[in-house]
From Swiss-Prot:
Entry GO CC: cytoplasm
Record carries keyword Protein biosynthesis: yes
SUPFAM superfamilies with a match to the protein in the record: Ribosome recycling factor, RRF
GO biological-process terms attached to the record: translation; translational termination
Residue stretches in coiled coil: none
Location (main, coarse): cytoplasm
Presence of the UniProt keyword Nucleotidyltransferase in the record: no
Location in the cell: Cytoplasm
Role according to the record: Responsible for the release of ribosomes from messenger RNA at the termination of protein biosynthesis. May increase the efficiency of translation by recycling ribosomes from one round of translation to another.
Name listed for the protein in its UniProt record: Ribosome-recycling factor
Molecular function (Gene Ontology), one example: ribosomal large subunit binding
Similarity field: Belongs to the RRF family.
Matches recorded under HAMAP family: RRF (MF_00040)
Amino acid sequence: MIKELEDIFKEAEKDMKKAVEYYKNEIAGLRTSRASTALVEEIKVEYYGSKVPIKQLGTISVPEHNQIVIQVWDQNAVPAIEKAIREELNLNPTVQGNVIRVTLPPLTEERRRELVRLLHKITEEARVRVRNVRREAKEMIEELEGISEDEKKRALERLQKLTDKYIDEINKLMEAKEKEIMSV
């Protein structure tokens, strides 16, 4: 019986970690006043009939605080990458041979507030994912046969502590990202 309980906790923790990792990847793509490779890495590009992230088509670097450079390995992919960046980021990259430069304009106050609103929306979705994991684990604990009410109560308290830990982690990541977005 205890083994079943431990399995429920392991599974719940694994799923909560996944939710936090997914959240980290999602907010990494949110633009701040500093250039970051995460801004373009996951943008999908049409390449020989399939959608491929830019990071698989070239080397991405940040030579200056407001510039991203993509050294494309296959010259044929350059127009598709340029188009994808225009569409996804609404920016105009400059192309020199197989090198694509993306210069980021400074963020306006209005755009910063917009990004913070988006950050809050993404954060709430992440919290909901963690709470859904808790709900599923709670249902599994309550359905367990052969454990006392006290054991169930302790298990549910432990589950709540686990949930709080991951919600706190999400909140800390959000606060750091918000500070990053709002800094000039």
